[in-house]
Amino acid sequence: MDKTAEDALKRMRMRSWRRGTKEMDLILGPFADARLAELPGSMLAGYDALLAENDQDLIRWVLGQSAPPARFAPLIAQIAAHAHGRLLPGL
C-alpha cells in the first residue's frame, strides 16, 4: 500500500471515530477498524463519500428506519451487519 492510500485510510478511520454523535462513533469506528483495509477501491471511495453524510441520516439508514440512497445501500448493509454482529451476537 502506498503512502497516499495509507493516509486516506487513516483519515477515514479518524473520521469514523470522530462523528457528531456517539452512536455513530460506536458504529462506524469499529467497522472502519475491522473492515476498511479490505474494501475494494470503489467501495472505499463510497465510504469516503458516506462520511460526509449527516449523522441523523446515517443512523436511520443503519437501523433500517429509512432507506439509504442506492449509491450507499451496499455499504450501509455491510455496516449494519457488522454492527449487528458485534452488538447483538447470536441473534
Feature locations, PLM:
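Positively charged, polar, low-complexity stretches
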Residues: 2-91
